[in-house]
Each structure stands twice: as C-alpha cells, then as structure tokens.
Amino acid sequence: MKDVTYYLISLASQSPAGSFGLNTNNLVTTLINIAVVLSLLIVFGKGFLRDFLDTRKNRIVNTIQISDELYSGAVEKLEKAQARLCKVEKEAKQLRVTGYSEIEQEKLNLINSTYKTLERLEKKKKETCSFEQQRAINDVRQWVLQQTLQRVLKTLNGSLNPELHLHTIRVNISMLGTLK
C-alpha cells in the first residue's frame, strides 16, 4: 500500500504544466469536491427534494385541516354539551324549587290536619268530660234523692199514724176540689 501512495505522490509532483495530474492541495480539492457534490445534488436532487418537501407540506396542511375540523367539531360538541348542561341545571333547579315548595305545602297540610285532629280530639274530650260530669251529677242526684226518700220514708213511717194519714188525705182532696 505504501508503494501505491508513493507512486501517486510522485506522479503528482512530476506532472508537467498544462497536463492533468493529481492535486495535492487539500483546501482546493475539498472545495472542488463540495462544489461538484452540491451541483450534482442541485441538478439531480432538485426534483426529489421538491417532491419530498411538497409531500411533507401537503401532509402538514392536511393534518392542520383535520385538526381544525376536529377542533371545530369538538367546539360544537362542547357548546351543545354546555347548552344541555345549562338546560339540565335549570330543570334541576326548577325541580328543586318545586320539590321544596311541594314539601313545604305538604308540611303545612300535615300541620293543619294535625291541628284540626287535635281540635276534634279536644272537643270530643270536652264533650266526654261534660257527659261524664253530667252523668256523675245525675248519679249523685239520684243517690241523694234515693237517700232522701229513704230518710223521709223512715221518718214518715216512724211518725205516721192513722189519724195523720187520714188528715193528709182530706187536705189533699180538698186542694184538688179547689183546683177544679
């Protein structure tokens, strides 16, 4: 391998002016190589690069359009959901208000019904007490009357003789006669 390298270097150093030879100046060689590669890339790679960039651009544009459509659809769905939520919240609030008012009404009805029942029970209690009191009074009157009659009968039986009995009958008959 050393022999080949020495041979190429010797050819380059011995080449006469105006002929084709090996350039040993690295800076110039590198610039020439870069210019050749760039020229080839521009000439042959221009179409490929344009197609690649156009395809990439189209994909990006399509992705953006799809994203915009999805975003618009999501915004519409969100607006519909928010409107539905607002409607449902209003209905729930209305039901709550209606429910509370119905509960309050039922509570008032129950209180009124209980109050009326208590009044009826109180009235019946008073009537029952009055009836029992009247019955007790009547029982006491009857007992007192019976006791009084028994005492009167005892007194009369003890003090009544046949003369007094005849005298009482005559007085009563005469009173009846004056009444006619």
UniProtKB/Swiss-Prot annotation:
Q: Provide the membrane topology annotation.
A: Single-pass membrane protein
Transmembrane regions listed in the UniProt entry:
27-49
Instruction: Quote the cellular component terms of the Gene Ontology held in the record.
Output: plastid membrane; proton-transporting ATP synthase complex
What the entry lists under Pfam families is as follows:
ATP-synt_B
Under Gene Ontology molecular function, one entry of this record is: proton transmembrane transporter activity
In terms of InterPro entries, this protein maps to: ATP_synth_b/b'su_bac/chlpt
Location(s) in or outside the cell: Plastid membrane
Q: Which family does it belong to?
A: Belongs to the ATPase B chain family.
Any idea what job this protein has?
F(1)F(0) ATP synthase produces ATP from ADP in the presence of a proton or sodium gradient. F-type ATPases consist of two structural domains, F(1) containing the extramembraneous catalytic core and F(0) containing the membrane proton channel, linked together by a central stalk and a peripheral stalk. During catalysis, ATP synthesis in the catalytic domain of F(1) is coupled via a rotary mechanism of the central stalk subunits to proton translocation.
Describe the protein's quaternary organization and the partners it interacts with: F-type ATPases have 2 components, F(1) - the catalytic core - and F(0) - the membrane proton channel. F(1) has five subunits: alpha(3), beta(3), gamma(1), delta(1), epsilon(1). F(0) has four main subunits: a(1), b(1), b'(1) and c(10-14). The alpha and beta chains form an alternating ring which encloses part of the gamma chain. F(1) is attached to F(0) by a central stalk formed by the gamma and epsilon chains, while a peripheral stalk is formed by the delta, b and b' chains.
Protein name per the record: ATP synthase subunit b, plastid
